[in-house]
């Protein structure tokens, strides 16, 4: 098995922490980024594990994202997988057709920032995988969901020649797959995402 470096945002969430634990259990190195890195350590465990780097990250701040990516590169030498929780969980019934709400703008800006943040390293490596986890359509504002899907599709076409794959995966599917998979099946599930 090749050791990879995973960059996981929203790492203190239930799904984020599970992804971090599974990647570590498979021998990978993980940058676990969240607004509260101490919560990551509480959920994930061993802060002494040299393969785990827990970082504070506001994904909306491009400079913070750049600094987190640089910290990951300095510590591990590359980034092979980005798993980003691109979520705006406001109900569709609360959609306001006026100016975009802050949470919509923040979700889309975070999506752009983390993708742009890791792409240079992945291009230079000639490989990488970017997975944006999105909420189920019924729990997600349509404009945010379609912004994420459209962005992923466009970026996937742009970066395919560099060996970088991009996908959007419903978070509930990722959670169900991780719960149902065991042993080597979990490796497959994580790679399929």
Regions found by a protein language model. Name each.
Residues 12-13:
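Conserved glycine-rich cofactor-binding loop
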Residues 26-41:
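Conserved glycine-rich Rossmann-like NAD(P)H-binding loop of the short-chain dehydrogenase/reductase
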């Amino acid at each position: 098995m090749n050791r990879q470096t995973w960059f996981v945002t929203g790492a203190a969430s239930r799904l984020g922490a599970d992804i971090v634990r599974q990647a570590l259990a498979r021998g990978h190195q993980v940058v676990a980024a969240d607004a509260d890195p101490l919560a990551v350590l509480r959920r994930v465990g061993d802060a002494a594990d040299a393969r785990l780097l827990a970082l504070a990250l506001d994904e909306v701040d491009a400079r913070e994202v750049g600094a987190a990516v640089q910290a990951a590169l300095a510590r591990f030498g590359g980034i092979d997988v980005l798993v980003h929780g691109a979520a705006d969980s406001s109900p569709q019934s609360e959609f306001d057709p006026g100016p975009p709400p802050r949470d919509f703008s923040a979700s889309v800006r975070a999506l752009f920032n983390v993708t742009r943040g890791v792409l240079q390293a992945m291009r230079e490596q000639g490989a990488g995988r970017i997975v944006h986890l999105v909420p189920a359509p019924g729990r997600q504002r349509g404009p945010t969901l379609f912004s994420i899907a459209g962005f992923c599709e466009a970026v996937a076409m742009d970066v395919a020649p560099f060996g970088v794959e991009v996908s959007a995966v419903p978070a509930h599917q990722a959670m169900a797959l991780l719960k149902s998979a065991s042993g080597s099946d979990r490796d497959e599930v994580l790679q399929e995402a």
